[in-house]
């Protein structure tokens, strides 16, 4: 840390293949774990645990009334159609929408990004985090609200997206509206 900012981060990781969930665990343990939960959050930093098939299984085990949320890390072919909450950051949203300029903050047409993400994935609720610019709440591919941020002294933004997904999911599972949850 220097002047309240993280200077360096070093991650050492093994090959993604070790992260795959055993099929037996998914069939035998996952349904009971989901049944005991008020909501489910899927997040794996694109390590290979979250697959289109696992998302389908989680949705089936959760049923239509239990919130399933995804903090997406874009990967080719990942299908997350019909999830209750998806919380990409600006760059992830651009990549998921397959838009030119993805990965930069220079070009971000929010209406088009939200429309494309809804068309491709039919998410019920999309909340795009925009860093210092706040968050966008979108339903049915339309922006419903832009929530600005309040200035704060931030020492480390690592895990900010995880925190947003966890807090939104907990609030929504407890009955809050998306606007109140944000």
Tell where the protein language model's regions lie, with residue ranges:
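Glycine-centered loop/turn positions within well-structured domains
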Residues: 8, 133, 166
């Amino acid at each position: 840390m220097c002047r309240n900012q993280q200077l360096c981060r070093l991650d050492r990781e093994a090959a993604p293949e070790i992260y795959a969930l055993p099929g037996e665990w998914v069939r035998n343990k996952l349904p009971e774990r989901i049944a005991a939960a008020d909501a489910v959050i899927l997040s794996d930093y694109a390590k290979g645990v979250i697959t289109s098939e696992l998302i389908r299984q989680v949705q089936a085990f959760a049923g239509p009334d239990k919130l399933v949320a995804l903090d997406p890390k874009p990967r080719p072919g990942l299908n997350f159609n019909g999830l209750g909450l998806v919380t990409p950051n600006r760059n992830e949203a651009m990549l998921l929408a397959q838009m030119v300029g993805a990965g930069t903050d220079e070009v971000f047409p929010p209406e088009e990004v939200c429309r494309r993400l809804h068309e491709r994935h039919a998410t019920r609720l999309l909340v795009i985090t925009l860093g210092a610019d706040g968050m966008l709440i979108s339903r049915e591919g339309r922006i419903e609200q832009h929530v600005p941020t309040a200035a704060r002294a931030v020492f480390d933004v690592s895990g900010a997206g995880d925190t947003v997904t966890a807090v939104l999911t907990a609030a929504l599972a407890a009955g809050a509206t998306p606007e109140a949850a944000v």
